């Protein structure tokens, strides 16, 4: 039996208190009188949850719902957010942390980035801002972080590629049908546009059961069932020389299979909780791997996403062995301000990672490990 499971204390927490989409830290008191359809001043937003509040206040209901919605009763959406607060730190003191900011840069598949987080693939950025994905690639370029454009975007692939700053590295997310001709075209196009890797989303074999999205007419009309197998993945690897990261790993068993089939990287993810309610969060999967097969973190590059809103969330995933952390909704909400909003969100998260690491007693982000987190639930719900 596993010695630790996040599910046990998350379920208790959900029964103990109401869910807050973003915590009450005073933003309503400060900006509550702002007319609907207006954004608060960018420089007065102090954390990633503020961008969610701003986007909900600014966007029409259907556009906001497209970004916000989750599967079915959205219990996995809640779990993605709340699970981080159940995992406690073990802070160390009397440590020289004065150079921790200099340890922020990392590599992803050998490419250099300024921080251990990236912009996850999200579609239809044009619902938030007229520049669409240009704001995401622009903000990522300003801050030196990875951006992974979705396969289905508002702006063309050429527009996105042309908006990159000199030397900026991007990966391309893909959905694939069991059609070699169409797949080869997608692969060749991604390479021609200068993307350095492919991110193959495998956790959406069928359409998501999204009640909130259906009410606002922004659900998917796709009723097809997708053919994805490990044998097919091996075949895909023979069709391109770009590395193919697998996005959507939700168990230690599949993480092992990904390693066996030569995946250069895996993303622990439940698709932003938009596909299967009751699916585990990236954090829970990272914990499962840490318990049952920690060697995986050295056999392939492991990334994770889902519910990340704070620097502390990033640190918890890094402590378990995750190399870099993805964020989707926060950057989509930040993109309501365009590239400057995306850059501002990245700056805020970098600052939080640095000061939270310092307060945790982490002198070097490359050296953080599971001794900094308490892997046994202490019975508290908040």
Residues of each region from the PLM?
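Fungal secretory targeting signals
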Residues: 1-17
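An N-cap/entry alpha-helix motif that binds or orients negatively charged groups
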Residues: 17-109, 219-220, 228, 368, ...
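Glycine-centered helix-coil hinge/cap
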Residues: 60, 338-339
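Short, conserved beta-strand segments within well-ordered enzyme catalytic domains
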Residues: 88, 105-107, 116-120, 146-148, ...
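Glycine-rich active-site/cofactor-binding loop and its immediate structural neighborhood
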Residues: 112-155
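Alpha/beta enzyme core
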Residues: 138, 163-166, 178-304, 311-335, ...
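A gly/proline- and charged-residue-enriched helix-loop-helix capping module
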Residues: 142-181
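Internal helix-turn-beta structural module
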Residues: 339-366, 373
């Amino acid at each position: 039996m596993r010695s630790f499971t996040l599910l046990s204390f998350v379920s208790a927490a959900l029964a103990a208190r109401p869910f807050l989409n973003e915590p009450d830290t005073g933003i309503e008191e400060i900006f509550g009188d702002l007319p609907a359809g207006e954004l608060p001043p960018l420089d007065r937003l102090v954390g990633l949850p503020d961008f969610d509040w701003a986007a909900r206040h600014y966007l029409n209901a259907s556009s906001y719902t497209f970004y916000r919605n989750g599967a079915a009763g959205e219990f996995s959406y809640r779990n993605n957010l709340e699970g981080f607060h159940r995992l406690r730190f073990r802070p160390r003191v009397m440590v020289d942390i004065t150079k921790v900011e200099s340890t922020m840069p990392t590599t992803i598949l050998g490419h250099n980035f300024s921080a251990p987080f990236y912009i996850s693939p999200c579609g239809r950025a044009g619902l938030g801002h007229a520049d669409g994905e240009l704001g995401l690639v622009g903000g990522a370029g300003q801050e030196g972080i990875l951006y992974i454009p979705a396969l289905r975007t508002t702006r063309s692939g050429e527009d996105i590629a042309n908006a990159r700053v000199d030397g900026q590295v991007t990966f391309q997310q893909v959905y694939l049908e069991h059609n070699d001709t169409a797949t080869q075209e997608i692969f060749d196009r991604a390479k021609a546009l200068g993307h350095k890797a492919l991110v193959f989303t495998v956790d959406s074999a069928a359409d998501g059961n999204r009640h909130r999205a259906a009410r606002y007419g922004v659900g998917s009309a796709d009723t097809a069932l997708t053919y994805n197998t490990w044998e097919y993945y091996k075949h895909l690897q023979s069709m391109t020389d770009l590395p193919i990261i697998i996005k959507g790993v939700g168990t230690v068993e599949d993480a092992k299979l990904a390693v066996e089939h030569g995946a250069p990287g895996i993303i622990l993810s439940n698709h932003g909780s938009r596909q299967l309610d009751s699916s585990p969060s990236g954090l829970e999967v990272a914990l499962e791997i840490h318990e049952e097969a920690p060697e995986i973190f050295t056999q392939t590059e492991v990334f994770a996403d889902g519910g990340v809103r704070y620097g502390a969330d990033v640190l918890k995933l890094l402590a378990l062995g995750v190399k870099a952390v993805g964020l989707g909704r926060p950057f989509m909400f930040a993109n309501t301000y365009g590239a400057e909003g995306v850059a501002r969100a990245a700056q805020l998260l970098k600052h939080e990672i640095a000061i939270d690491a310092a307060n945790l007693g982490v002198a070097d982000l490359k050296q953080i490990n599971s001794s900094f987190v308490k892997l046994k639930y202490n019975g508290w719900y908040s």
